[in-house]
């Protein structure tokens, strides 16, 4: 896409929101409580603040304010307000490709924010536990928050990811013509690295005329030992392993497809 010469500030709002899910099997009530305590500490407010602060560094944003809170009995939230940085538009990379991991990308932001909320969850029946992190990066300026996507998914390793990206509003060029998007995008997947794409099965649901893009990701490889909390698969009977595998896989598919699936 040809670079636009704008009249005034770029007024487009670009919002990236995604949920990541971590699934676990905990056999006893004590193990379920232990998993919730473990994941709650792993993604506490301080660590989430570090991740979001690095995200600001990646997109070149100035941090104005940080609000963070750990909740009882579990959960945490962090919201960071960020401001614009003066930047030469010639330095902005508008091409459709994966963003960096720790490297810095210049951004031009205004009235923007980055926030995350966590939701640990378990049920006494079935032994299944889930952890969801809900993240939103919203910017107003010349760069898409998709540049932070690669880093965030690498930091928050997950079994399932659902991603939404939307461009809202319009900006005007020097001739007064309105532009409702200022960069090319065919798929959110184009902003992911090849190693990440190789790990997940992915599907897109895009509404191009509305500048709405959606991608769902489900981890390809399933190894039972990675889903057990304080229990080794070899300590279980073959029947138990099969039943737990079926329960975990059903749980993951239900979350991925967003609907309950009847037992076969």
Swiss-Prot record:
Keyword list, A-Z: Autocatalytic cleavage, Decarboxylase, Lyase, Polyamine biosynthesis, Pyruvate, S-adenosyl-L-methionine, Schiff base, Spermidine biosynthesis, Zymogen
Active-site residues, as the UniProt record annotates them: 112 (schiff-base intermediate with substrate), 117 (proton acceptor), 140 (proton donor)
Residues with Pyruvic acid (Ser) modification: 112
Swiss-Prot/TrEMBL cofactor(s): pyruvate
GO molecular function: adenosylmethionine decarboxylase activity
Disulfide-bonded cysteines: none
Coiled coil: none
UniProt pathway: Amine and polyamine biosynthesis; S-adenosylmethioninamine biosynthesis; S-adenosylmethioninamine from S-adenosyl-L-methionine: step 1/1
GO cellular component, one term: cytosol
Major enzyme class: lyase
Site residues, Cleavage (non-hydrolytic): 111-112
Reactions this protein catalyses: S-adenosyl-L-methionine + H(+) = S-adenosyl 3-(methylsulfanyl)propylamine + CO2
EC number of this enzyme: 4.1.1.50
Taxonomy, superkingdom: Bacteria
GO process terms (BP): spermidine biosynthetic process
One Pfam short name: AdoMet_dc
Cofactor note: Binds 1 pyruvoyl group covalently per subunit.
Subunit structure: Heterooctamer of four alpha and four beta chains arranged as a tetramer of alpha/beta heterodimers.
HAMAP family noted in UniProt: AdoMetDC_2
NCBIfam families reported in the protein's UniProt record: SAM_DCase_Eco (TIGR03331)
Protein family membership: Belongs to the prokaryotic AdoMetDC family. Type 2 subfamily.
UniProt-recorded name of the protein: S-adenosylmethionine decarboxylase proenzyme
Source species: Salmonella heidelberg (strain SL476)
């Amino acid at each position: 896409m040809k670079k636009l010469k704008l009249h005034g500030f770029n007024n487009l709002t670009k919002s990236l929101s995604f949920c990541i899910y971590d699934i676990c099997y905990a056999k006893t009530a004590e193990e379920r409580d232990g998993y919730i305590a473990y994941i709650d500490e792993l993604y506490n407010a301080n660590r989430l603040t570090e991740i979001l602060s690095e995200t600001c560094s990646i997109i070149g944003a100035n941090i104005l304010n940080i609000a963070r809170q750990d909740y009882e009995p579990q959960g945490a939230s962090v919201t960071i307000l960020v401001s614009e940085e003066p930047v030469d538009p010639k330095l902005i990379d508008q091409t459709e490709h994966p963003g960096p991991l720790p490297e810095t990308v210049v951004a031009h932001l205004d009235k923007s924010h980055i926030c995350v909320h966590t939701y640990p969850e378990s049920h006494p029946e079935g032994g299944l536990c889930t952890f969801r992190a809900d993240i939103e990066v919203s910017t107003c300026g010349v760069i898409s928050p998709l540049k932070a996507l690669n880093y965030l998914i690498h930091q928050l390793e997950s079994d399932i990811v659902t991603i939404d990206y939307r461009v809202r509003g319009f900006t005007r060029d020097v001739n007064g013509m309105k532009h409702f998007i200022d960069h090319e995008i065919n798929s959110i997947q184009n902003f992911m690295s090849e190693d990440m794409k190789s790990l997940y099965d992915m599907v897109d649901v895009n509404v191009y005329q509305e500048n709405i893009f959606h991608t769902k990701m489900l981890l390809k490889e399933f190894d039972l030992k990675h889903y057990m909390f304080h229990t080794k698969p070899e300590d279980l009977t073959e029947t138990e392993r099969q039943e737990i595998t079926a329960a975990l896989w059903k749980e993951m598919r239900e979350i991925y497809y967003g609907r309950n699936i009847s037992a076969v």
